[in-house]
Each structure stands twice: as C-alpha cells, then as structure tokens.
Amino acid sequence: MPIAIVGIGYVGLVSAACFADLGVEVYCVDVDEAKIQRLRDGEIPIYEPGLDALVRRGVEAGRLHFSTSIAEVLPHVEIIFSAVGTPPDEDGSADLRHVLSVARAIGEAMTDYCLVVTKSTVPVGTYLKVRETIEAAQRERGVSIPFDVASNPEFLKEGNAIEDFMRPDRVVVGVDSDRARELMTRLYKPILLNNFRVIFMDIASAEITKYAANAMLATRISFMNEVANLCEAVGANVSMVRQGIGSDARIGSKFLYSGCGYGGSCFPKDVQAFIRTAKEYGRPMRVLEAVEAVNDAQKHVLFEKFSRYFGGDLKGRRVAVWGLAFKPETDDMREAPSLVLINSLLEAGCEVAVYDPIAMPEARRRLGDRVRYARDVYDSALDVDAIFHVTEWKAFRMPAWEVLHRSVKTPLLIDGRNVFDTDPVEAGFTLLQIGQ
C-alpha cells in the first residue's frame, strides 16, 4: 500500500525510512528542492544513528521516492502523512501554517479518496482545521471528493528513533471513520504481527495524548531538579533519593535524573503549546507553568556554581564546555542547556572552548567565531579554570583524568549530568554536581 509523507525533516525522514524497511512504498515530499536533491544524491540531511543505512536500503529496494510536489504523488497513494514543522509563535502556541498549507495543497490536487494523517505535533482541534481547509479547497474547484482525516502522533526519541519506530511502546491512532481505521490497521499490520500495541481512539484524544506525554516527562525532569536543589541545601544526595523513589513500581526510574535542564525540539515547544492551548480553553495548567519556569532556571545552575566558586571573579577566565547537543546521539542544539551556559560565560568575559562528538558543525552555525572549537576533550581543557560537563556522551565518561589534571589551570569539574564518581576526584579535581 503506497503512502506519501510530506515534510522530510527528522520525523518525516525517519518514518519514511522505517515504513520502507517494513515493505511499504513511500513517496517523500518536501518543498525544499535542495533537500530533495541531496536525498536523491544519497546525502542524509540529519544525523540519527542507523538512518543512513536505512535510507540507502529503501532507495536500493525501490521503495523510497523523493519529490517536491504533492500533486505529483497523490495519484499513487491512498494515505498521505503530514509531518511538517509546527514551530512556536511568540506567545508559545503552535504555528499551524505549514500543516494547513499541506492540507490546502491536498484539497487542490486530490482526484480520488485519500486519508490525510497528521503526524506533526499539533494542538487539539487541529484535525477540524485540516478538514475545513481541504473542504474549502475542494469548493473552490467545484468538486466534492471523499476523504478522511486522522492523527498518528510520533513518539520518537532522538538518538533512538529507529528502534522506537520498529519496536514501539505503543502506536497511537486517532480516527473517526471505519474506513480510516481499516487503512491504518493495514498499514501497521507488521507492527501488530510483532505484538506491539496499536491504540485506536478519537482524533481529539490522539492530539492531546502527544502533548500530555511530553508534558508528563518534562514534569518529572523539573520535579527531580527541584528535589536536587533541595538536596544541595540540606546535605542530601539526589542520586540516593532517585533510587529510593524509583524502586517504587508506581513511579519507576525513568526520567528521574536531575541535571542542567531539558532542551531539544519537543519538550520546550510542546510544554509551551500545551500551556497556551489550555489557556485558550479557560483551563490554565499551573503545574506546567511551574515546570517551564523551573527548567528555565535550571539552565543557569552550572554558571551559578562556577560564579560562586570564584566569588564572581570571572572576567578573562578560560573554560571548556563538553557537550553541545541537548542530549547524546544527536546533533540537535535547539533549546540546549549548553547555549544558555555559553552565552552566560561569554557575557561574563570568559574565553570558551567547546567540544561535542557530533554537534560541532551545528555549533559553528549557531555560535560562529565567539568560541574556540576544540579537537577533543584534551584540547578543550588546555589551561582552563573549569570544565563543564553538559551532555552525557559516552565519550566523556572515562578520559585520562591525570592527563587532564596536568593540562588545566584550575582542576574544577562542574558535572551537569551527575555521571562522574570518584575518578576525577582521585586525580585531584574538585567535582561539583547537582543535588549532591
């Protein structure tokens, strides 16, 4: 059953490659002609472990096609996914221009029934706007062609997206017709055959599910960061607290790690949009407002520790920042805690050297010549007054601490992810962590 996916960004390309690997013929559509040409030339525009090989396999099997035209691919498919971006407006609400532009293009070009599935993260009620937009485009053409809309939100974690797609905790599908349900059941048959859960529900519930899931995870992170800050004040250890509460089966241990705040393309944007949606319906989410405020403050914790250590005497100090992406196994620096830290350091007059195993090209794009780009952790640490550990890449876990101790000016290690134990201390470093 051929399908089309419009919007070949992170979600769209991963979904397309995975569907193709399951035997589905996929037409990938994006208005960015340069991106489509790069894909045709075999270049992958995003970093995700295993994605290059998966895309190549799909192309070689003849199951992945690339186009810039919705009208060109519509005659070949019965299901068309919209996976375009929904960036936040100034007020935090999701910008639906791209989603509705896709809907309009479908309404202008469709000649036969199709199921229009929104995979983008969108506010509740978006499916009604998509339906109205397609109907309006048809009216302008003087036609009335049947179609259905559905919601199929993604739950992919950057760095583990292929595994998440192929072996999901669940697949959420929102439909409002038997035909739409039957088509989505056929599409996800390989998932069902492997005994993974496909949960059908109404469309509004599916749209809320995505926001609620990310908001819940963000809440756990901010809660543990609040606990960590209290632990520091009273002399407790947040790692011990995490073990104590995480062993409770009702709570579990996932997303209970304190640190220097969350970032990325999902949590900050989705929490803001969920807050905005709730306000529009007269149901303010005060818990999420606090979650957001806590996270904003937490991104300043590492700089505050550094400033206290030196009594505010920071001008001219050299520092190293390890980890620039918002999490390991990605080059995504959107809303990354590293950016807040680096900006604070530069404003204080510090000289900053940075290193990340993957995100250096993205860092150059964002930071320009304001920082020094190190070759590795050892190069970054030459004659510095502090090393900041911001992203928990495995490559940072076991460096030669004795070598680093001889390289630095001041043996200060500020660990924003609480991953180091006694090794740096035994080598002579002062270790500052969060909540312990």
Language model features with spans:
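Structural/interface elements that position substrates and couple domains in central-metabolism enzymes
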Residues: 1-436
